[in-house]
Amino acid sequence: VASHALNIFGDHSDVYACRQTGCAMLCESSVQEVMDLTPVAHCAALKGKIPFINFFDGFRTSHEIQKIETWDYEDLEDLVDKDAIKEFRAHALNPNHPCERGSAQNPDTFFQAREACNPYYDAMPAIVQEYMDKVNAKIGTNYKLFNYHGAEDAESVIIAMGSVCDTIDETIDYLLAQGKKVGVVKVRLYRPFCAQALVDAIPDTVKYINVLDRTKEPGSLGEPLYL
């Protein structure tokens, strides 16, 4: 239970509680996206050497009955980096080549060691996009770290994450037919958060940005996705 009550309808409090664990976080908004992007999370974790939380809305997505195009193991063959798998296994704990982890460090070295992981997080967005591009080339999709849907000259844009994005897509299409200049940005890679990729996804004409969060963080100036 992440808040005052248990909720199976896609509150994001539980996954937001993990955002400072150091895990990369990839979100899908539909059953088909779960099938398509789960390989991205696995492959990026191996190549980028960062653990992933691959998440989607409970019940709204996890229990949805929907026809999808499924993947076979053979479909993953050309996505997987075999060298990355070997390197991953080589770093596993093994009594034949022991190593020290979780040591006690004094102030002179603690934060130096803490900052040493920065290059891995800086590189991760490009790695995720690399594997998204491979998936796009394979099945004809257009997955990005942040996907935009709407008018090219939109003045008002919604930023959202999770199953609500599919509903927003349909609403945007309805409003576009009425001549409204609106759009939606769907967040896929939440951590590490790539600010430049978000800026690139938003049209230059935008005047208003509305961030829809599915959680409440009491005492904060804003909710996690907004911040």
Where are these regions (language model features)?
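A glycine-rich helix N-cap at a beta->alpha junction
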Residues: 1, 76-84, 208-212
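Thiamine diphosphate
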Residues: 2-5, 18, 133-227
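Short, conserved acidic/polar surface loops in the N-terminal third of protein domains
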Residues: 3-8, 65-66
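Conserved thiamine diphosphate
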Residues: 6-58, 82
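Electropositive phosphate-/nucleotide-binding environments in soluble metabolic enzymes
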Residues: 12, 28-35, 104-107, 114, ...
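A short secondary-structure junction signal
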Residues: 36-39, 64-67, 169-172
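Conformationally flexible catalytic loops at phosphate/diphosphate-handling active centers
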Residues: 52-147
